[in-house]
Amino acid sequence: MALSLSLFLGGRVRTSLARCGFASQVMAGPGSVSCEPDPDSDWEPEERELQEVESALKRQKKAMRFQKIRRQMEAPGAPPRTLTWEAMEQIRYLHKEFAESWSVPRLAEGFDVSTDVIRRVLKSKFVPTLEQKLRQDQKVLKKAGFTREIGQLPVSEDTLKALSAGRSVSGLLMAGDEVSSKSQNHSTALKVAKSHPHSTDAQKKREGRDKRIQVLEESLVPATTALGHQRELQKSATSDSEATGRAGSDTLPSAVLLEELKPGEPGDQSFSSKVVQRGHDFFDSNGNFLYRI
C-alpha cells in the first residue's frame, strides 16, 4: 500500500515538473534553469491531490502505530473463546444474508461480546475438525458457568454421522447427560430473558405484588381467626345464659303453684300441709319432691 502510494506520488510530481518546463530544459542541454509556470495550467487540482495523498499516508502511519501499541498492551495470543461454533456460524450467516440489519455493533450486542470478537469471527476462515469443535465447545460451556465437570466425550461414528447430518455440536454435548441438559435449558432461559427484558421486568413486578398480597393475607388470617373465636365465645356464653334462664324458669314454681301449696288451704289432698327444705330442694312431709330453687 505504501509502495503504491509513493509511486503514485512520484508520478504526480513528475507530471507537475513536466508542466512547468523543467523536463524540456533538461532535454535541450545545460543552461540556466528557470521554471516558469504555464499561465494556462490549473495548479489547484494538482495541489489538492497531493494533499489527499499526504493525508492518506499520515492516516495509514497513525493506524499502524495504533495497532502496534494495541498489540503491545494486550495479552499475547488469541483471546479466550466465548462463543460456540454454532453461534459463530450463526453470526457469519446473519452478517452475510442480512448485512444491513445485522451490523457488527448489533451482532456484538445480540451475542453479548465485543465488536473485536465479532470482527475476528467474520475474518476467520479456519475450518476445524469435528474433534476440535467438540473440545472447544466443551471449554466454552465450562467457562459459561457450568461448574459440573464434563468428561471428555468419545467421538464415535454415530457422533460423526450426526454432525455431518447437520446436528448442532452443543446438542450432542448435552445428549445423555441430565444435569447438563438442565444447565442448557437454564442458559436458553437466560438468552430469552436477555432478548425480552421488558417481559422479565413485568414478571418480576407481578411476582413481587403476589408475594406482598400473600404476606398481607397471612397477617390477616390470625386476626380474623381470633375475631371469629371471640364471636363464638360470645355466642356460646349467650346461649348458656339463655339455657340457664330457661332451666330456671322450668324449675322455679309459678305463683299459682305456690298458692296451691300453701299450708292450711283446702286443695289437692295429695299434698301435705308441711313443706321441708333441704338445700335448694323442697319436699313434703311424706318425702315427695316438690320443686327446686
UniProtKB/Swiss-Prot annotation:
Which sites does the entry annotate for glycosylation? N185
A biological process (GO) of this protein is: mitochondrial ribosome assembly
Q: Name one GO cellular component term.
A: extracellular region
Chief localization class?
nucleus
Chain spans, region Disordered: 177-210, 224-254
Q: Which residues carry this modification: Phosphoserine?
A: S41
Q: In which tissues is it expressed?
A: Expressed in heart, brain, liver and kidney. In brain, mainly expressed in neurons rather than glial cells.
Q: Relate the induction remark in this record.
A: Highly up-regulated in neuroblastostoma cells by RA and MG132 treatment inducing neurite outgrowth.
Q: Where in the cell is it found?
A: Nucleus; Secreted; Mitochondrion membrane
Q: Which residues form the signal peptide?
A: 1-18
Q: Where is the composition biased (Basic and acidic residues)?
A: 198-210
The reply on keyword Mitochondrion is: yes
A Gene Ontology molecular function term of the record:
rRNA binding
Sorted keywords for this record are: Developmental protein, Differentiation, Glycoprotein, Membrane, Mitochondrion, Nucleus, Phosphoprotein, Secreted, Signal
Q: Taxonomically, which superkingdom? A: Eukaryota
Disulfide pairings: none
On subunit structure and binding partners, the annotation says: Forms a regulatory protein-RNA complex, consisting of RCC1L, NGRN, RPUSD3, RPUSD4, TRUB2, FASTKD2 and 16S mt-rRNA. Interacts with 16S mt-rRNA; this interaction is direct.
The role this protein plays is: Plays an essential role in mitochondrial ribosome biogenesis. As a component of a functional protein-RNA module, consisting of RCC1L, NGRN, RPUSD3, RPUSD4, TRUB2, FASTKD2 and 16S mitochondrial ribosomal RNA (16S mt-rRNA), controls 16S mt-rRNA abundance and is required for intra-mitochondrial translation of core subunits of the oxidative phosphorylation system.
Q: Which family does it belong to?
A: Belongs to the neugrin family.
Q: What is this protein's name?
A: Neugrin
Tell me the organism: Mus musculus
